[in-house]
Amino acid sequence: MSTAARRRLMRDFKRLQSDPPAGISGAPLENNILMWQAVIFGPDDSIWEGATFKLSLQFSEEYPNDAPTVKFLSKMFHPNVYADGSICLDILQNQWSPIYDIAAILTSIQSLLCDPNPNSPANSESARLFRENKREYNRKVKEIVEQSWSS
């Protein structure tokens, strides 16, 4: 069955394979183009450097008109990531546009690591530490980075 969503996902996949953004990879599961796994590496020269985070992306037949559901599979401590791994990011919600492809989604999530929005917290403890106690926030992020190596 060849739908517009599946054709678009194949195009996104080919583009991701031929011109991958730095620190990002992703691919559909073997038997389901609507389910993807991705890896985001922590940006260099940041407290996230060296991290390897796994994510899942679930697309509907309405993609690219509807945003995918994206979750961290790796443990995460970040102001904009819920306990279940869901991500509070405007382009995955009210600012979604069909112009975003998978590379843009993953790049935006990678950027969010270093540039959180503590005013729209999904994790209130992380947001509070980010605003009020950067040293403790950085310590907890370092723990998550180290845990990401074995997850």
UniProtKB/Swiss-Prot annotation:
Documented EC number(s): 2.3.2.23
MF (Gene Ontology): ATP binding; ubiquitin conjugating enzyme activity
Keywords from the UniProt entry: ATP-binding, Nucleotide-binding, Transferase, Ubl conjugation pathway
Entry annotation: catalytic residues: 88
Transmembrane region(s): none
Catalytic reaction list: S-ubiquitinyl-[E1 ubiquitin-activating enzyme]-L-cysteine + [E2 ubiquitin-conjugating enzyme]-L-cysteine = [E1 ubiquitin-activating enzyme]-L-cysteine + S-ubiquitinyl-[E2 ubiquitin-conjugating enzyme]-L-cysteine
GO cellular component: HULC complex
GO biological process: DNA repair; proteasome-mediated ubiquitin-dependent protein catabolic process; protein polyubiquitination
Pathway note: Protein modification; protein ubiquitination
Ranges for domain UBC core: 4-150
Family per similarity comment: Belongs to the ubiquitin-conjugating enzyme family.
Function field: Catalyzes the covalent attachment of ubiquitin to other proteins.
Name by which UniProt lists this protein: Ubiquitin-conjugating enzyme E2 2
Organism for this UniProt entry: Dictyostelium discoideum (Social amoeba)
Taxonomic path: Eukaryota, Amoebozoa, Evosea, Eumycetozoa, Dictyostelia
